[in-house]
Structures are given as C-alpha cells and as structure tokens.
C-alpha cells in the first residue's frame, strides 16, 4: 500500500537533495519517487547522500510536467509555507498522513514538494486537493527539502503503522473519487462551456476558473457526481448548438 504513495519533487536543482530525500523516504518505508523536470539529473552525489537508498534514486520516475506525475492519482497534497491569494483546504502533517494512507488503499496518492527556493507556484498548488503546512518555529522556519519530506513521510508511516497494529486495513472510502486526469478534463469542459455561453471571455477568465477550482476542490465530488456535472455541461452545449 505504501507503494501507492508518490513523493513528487518539482524542478529540483541540487542532486544532493534528491539523495537526501531518497534516504528520508526509505527510512519511512516509501520508495515511489517522481522527479518533475529536474534541473539536474541524479548523479554520484545523489547516490552518496542517499546512503543506502540508491535504489529509490535508480527507480525514480523522471517526467516533464506535474500533470504527468499526478496522472492516475485520486488525492494530491501540495506543501506550502506561504499564504496565497486564494485560501485552500489545509492539512497539518498528521492529517496528511492519515488521509494519504486511507486513500492509498485503493488508488495512488501524490505528495508534492516544490523548488528549493520558491516552492510550488500558485498554478501548481491549484492542482492539489489539499495543502499541507509544517508548523515549524515561526522565528526560524527554514526547513530544507529533505527535512520537509522527512516530516511528512514520518506521519505517513505512523498512520500506516496504526492500521497494522490494530490488525486492520487502512480506513478507506467506499465511494470512488475521480482521478486527477478526470478532474482536469472536467475543468477544461467547464471552461469551454462558460466561454461558449459568454460567462467568461476568451483569454480573460479572471479569477472565475480559479474560484471554481477551489469550490470543487473543497466539495470533492465523487466520481458519479462528476459524471452528472459533465452531463449538465454537455446538455448546455447541446442547447447552445440548437439556437
């Protein structure tokens, strides 16, 4: 089940950080590392700092875009240390661990970490169902990438161990949630429908689509509910064609 949890690093710029992250992951039983458009490729320094977790580096999936890394996932959590223009559903690391383990019973989960200096962009954070923030010392809150991964990975492991000690499988939802791919298709369909009705203007959607993403992220529709919404959009399009 832990194999279903992806640690996703976006545009990492130092190979040593890749190795340190691999070590942090493996100590907590996580091995599924994804590298999104890394600015450098894993090298001997990454292997050296992995300190016995070189297999995690060797098996890492290297992809061009964040969408590639999120494909097939039903839950995405992005790390964020900064306040944003649009508030987003937040988790603390413990809640993140519990949700990740519960969801990973059935489908892949992505825990996304940003660039060493600037983290994740607003656009990248809007692809996440939740944001997670580590409550570090406000007078000195500087966690490096591997430290942040270690904190989250520890909480994932604690949540997983709790299910083992109770001789139970992780609690999971009976009703399936749509994968990230399905949600992105829905958002594309929604934007196209709003354009065709004149609700938003071509090239100038303003904050409407961002706020709608936040609304549906907060509501987190089930797969059947998303299908209903897609059906409504299709019906609107059909009516427009008949005019």
Swiss-Prot record:
What Gene3D superfamilies does the record tag this protein with?
1.10.8.590, 3.40.1280.10
Which lineage is the organism of this entry classified under, starting from the top rank? Bacteria, Pseudomonadati, Pseudomonadota, Gammaproteobacteria, Enterobacterales
Q: Does the keyword Coiled coil apply?
A: no
Q: Which reaction does it catalyse?
A: cytidine(32) in tRNA + S-adenosyl-L-methionine = 2'-O-methylcytidine(32) in tRNA + S-adenosyl-L-homocysteine + H(+); uridine(32) in tRNA + S-adenosyl-L-methionine = 2'-O-methyluridine(32) in tRNA + S-adenosyl-L-homocysteine + H(+)
Designated gene of the protein: trmJ
Q: Which organism is it from?
A: Citrobacter koseri (strain ATCC BAA-895 / CDC 4225-83 / SGSC4696)
The record's Pfam families line, in alphabetical order, gives: SpoU_methylase (PF00588)
Q: What is this protein called?
A: tRNA (cytidine/uridine-2'-O-)-methyltransferase TrmJ
Q: Which family does it belong to?
A: Belongs to the class IV-like SAM-binding methyltransferase superfamily. RNA methyltransferase TrmH family.
Please describe the quaternary structure of this protein. Answer: Homodimer.
């Amino acid at each position: 089940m832990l194999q279903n949890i992806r640690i996703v690093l976006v545009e990492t710029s130092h190979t040593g950080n890749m190795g340190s992250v691999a070590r942090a992951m493996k100590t907590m039983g996580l091995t599924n590392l994804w590298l999104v458009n890394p600015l450098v490729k894993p090298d001997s320094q990454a292997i050296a700092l992995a300190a016995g977790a070189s297999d995690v580096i060797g098996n890492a999936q290297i992809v061009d875009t964040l969408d590639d890394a999120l494909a097939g996932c039903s839950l995405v959590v992005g790390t964020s240390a900064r306040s944003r223009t649009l508030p987003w559903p937040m988790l603390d690391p413990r809640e993140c661990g519990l949700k990740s383990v519960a969801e990973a019973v059935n489908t892949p989960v992505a825990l996304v970490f940003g660039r060493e200096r600037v983290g994740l962009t607003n656009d990248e954070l809007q692809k996440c169902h939740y944001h997670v923030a580590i409550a570090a010392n406000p007078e000195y809150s500087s966690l490096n990438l591997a430290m942040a991964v270690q904190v989250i990975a520890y909480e994932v492991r604690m949540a997983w161990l709790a299910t083992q000690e109770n001789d139970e499988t992780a609690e999971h939802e009976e009703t399936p949630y749509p994968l990230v791919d399905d949600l992105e298709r829905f958002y594309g369909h929604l934007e196209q429908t709003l354009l065709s009705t004149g609700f938003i203007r071509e090239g100038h959607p303003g904050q409407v689509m961002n706020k709608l993403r936040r609304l549906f992220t907060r509501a987190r529709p089930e797969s059947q509910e998303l299908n209903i919404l897609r059906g409504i959009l299709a019906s609107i399009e059909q009516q427009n064609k008949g005019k």
